């Protein structure tokens, strides 16, 4: 037992031994020195390679100090990690474990701890920002890390630390005055800010996302594209407003299905769908196709073999091999020719005919008594025939078969031939009856379709009547089919080609004319085929359903055109959307690729995962469908006072966004007038004519017409004053929720306008960016949830105030910076930059000998080079002017992207600023840990005070506890603040 316990302790101490051995090419025991003891592997010094022999306490030759083996020993000679950079050796991603003290690494659960090793990909990109950590500004973020005083994780880029005033004074002369110091320090801060903006622009000016924002050509093109999307959405909204779709739905969570239908209708219209495609919303989702498994077929056939003794024909069928062994069943219903003999479906075999006429008549009489036995007989007969055909084919192909097998095949052929000879007469009679029934059905259909005033029946076909007639004809044909014998369904293909069709074309095949019929009958049946064309015409398309792939990591240098070039090779590709980069992810982006619903999205995702774009793995995964498209908001929003405040907010947001994108400007007056004529009645909601003057909200938007009528608040103030009713009495228990349906209908129209046109979810106080390129063009909406029973006026006022603050981002207008403001930030002059460009391309080789590097030509003077550049290299000069405008557009944006400030640039405490970066960190316990040597508090015990802990329990009152004794000089003046 002692040996077993020792072995157990060894395994418990070294739980990663097997994982390390898997990375080694040779066994670990062979690498151990031979001079050690037998149990030297159990020594603590080997388990902990950072301890020396003195720490181990002796105990074997293997107990000396060892170095930690390199990861190459563990990893072997396999390929490098998937997410690794080519120029950097890294351990496998699965072996990266966070330290317990690194709380900063988990500060951001979304992008914290570099889950996809973006930092490893971005080593080449980091060199662009190497100038950020220049001398005099402290170490870079990656060098300092979380413990270097930066206070941020190594995955976040920041600006270099700006010198404090004290550090700046150390660089100046001692005799400098205070005013001169402040002036120079202000200039230093201005130059520092200009330098950071310029370096950020140079680092990102070649990236597509940056060009779409500020480039003079690309930004205009992108703005026009977005404006086109908004115009199309506006047209769709006005169309839905005109036909009453918008007015028939309320933005309540109880009407989730109606809201989803409105959103899907918008998507279908945006995708170019027609009213015919909208019928797909009324159809129920189809069941998934049945997948036939061969294992179940074997068991079913085995069950049939077990039921053989119950069949009345077992005595004759026992000599055939098909009754005892399970045979192959069909997977789809087709005719029983010899080429697809294994695709027959036993479900179409009807228990009407046997091997001869008498047995068939007897079976008809016994059918009500024993139906299961008849089915089993038919299935066995079908299997027998398959085996006979198989034997017949094999006997024709194989010349070396034995005489016994030949005789069996001949006997089988004789039985089959006799069977068909017996059934021939009965088949002809039933065929005539079936043709007669089909003639009657076609005549009835023709009488219903032909109108008295129309000479052509195709022009007056009503789809509903056609469907009803078709269903009646199909029922009659099914009845005729049940009367047909088994032999008729098993005829060769030369008898009737119409019987080749599958189950989905069964009704069409039944209406086709038979061979040898009269011409009048053929014409009538042809008209029935026209009914099929009416029914099976263009089916509605499910344009609102898509499949999509999510790209987790896209390098900043990857363009949208490159992704489109890869995705266009796959069928069903629709569009691609790329999100704006985030500084937390080192400017890496995310993307969504949209395909049609009928593609194999997993196969496409697998193909994308096997491809690398610009040496970057995109990390493609399948994007799931939206789980809940209608999500509830606070039910207090249905209160009348809150609804009126929401109408005011929605109207302001709509006007601000319309003005930002110039949706209802004078240039589109004709379109706006047409829209007003279409939606004028429903926009006013019966409150008056649309031509009446509106005050406060002057907009051509039909949704905002006469909106001020609903913004005037009414109250019975005089009545309450006379009756002595005070509003404070309601604050105790609150007042019930008061709903005003007229106000709610106006608010719903505004909320849906913001959601459909501007992609603003009002009740979620957020905007869904680039929604027209996303897989779901109208995906999620928040609606009013269940209302509470009562609400106080204090809650109402707080809710209105809080909601107003959350929506300020849509209420504030974006104002570009003026020329004076951007001049302070380092704006450039186009003519000055052009002059610098000319001077840079004018080189003096010798006296009266000048060179133009752009063309390599030599000139006698610089004025000739200047004229040459403006004449022959005009496109280069134009590029310089565009570059200047590009940079100035970046400076004009008040919300321009830039690196966050270094934490050291903010105002620090005196203790932090006095300690240099070269000192070791203080020996304080971690923030979230107890001090060293203290045990955690027990349950029910005391504890320490603080924000996250309960107050300390005191056994005695505060005044009875021991007071702190202080000492002071007796000659000192009396200080009442001193403690005694």
Swiss-Prot record:
Gene Ontology CC annotation, any one: nuclear body
Keywords carried by this UniProt record: Nucleus, Phosphoprotein, RNA-mediated gene silencing
GO annotation terms (biological process): defense response to Gram-negative bacterium; negative regulation of viral genome replication; primary miRNA processing; regulatory ncRNA-mediated post-transcriptional gene silencing; siRNA processing
Renumbered residue ranges of the record's region Disordered: 1-104, 133-155, 290-540, 675-697, 889-922
Biased composition (Acidic residues): 336-346
Phosphoserine PTM positions: 85, 311, 454
Ranges of compositional bias, category Polar residues: 485-495, 517-526, 682-697
UniProt feature, compositional bias: Basic residues: 381-392
InterPro entries membership: RBD_domain_sf, SE/Ars2, SERRATE/Ars2_C, SERRATE/Ars2_N
RNA-binding in keyword set: no
Molecular-function GO terms, alphabetical: nucleic acid binding
Keyword Nucleus: yes
Feature: compositional bias, Basic and acidic residues: 8-33, 40-49, 305-316, 353-380, 414-450, 461-483, 497-514, 530-539
Biased composition (Gly residues): 55-64
Residue positions where Phosphotyrosine is found in the record: 83
Coiled-coil regions listed in the entry: none
Primary location recorded for the protein, binned into one broad class: nucleus
Subcellular location: Nucleus
Role according to the record: Acts as a mediator between the cap-binding complex (CBC) and RNA-mediated gene silencing (RNAi). Involved in innate immunity via the short interfering RNAs (siRNAs) processing machinery by restricting the viral RNA production. Also involved microRNA (miRNA)-mediated silencing by contributing to the stability and delivery of primary miRNA transcripts to the primary miRNA processing complex containing drosha and pasha.
Record's subunit section: Interacts with cbp20, Dcr-2 and pasha.
The family this protein is said to belong to: Belongs to the ARS2 family.
Full protein name: Serrate RNA effector molecule homolog
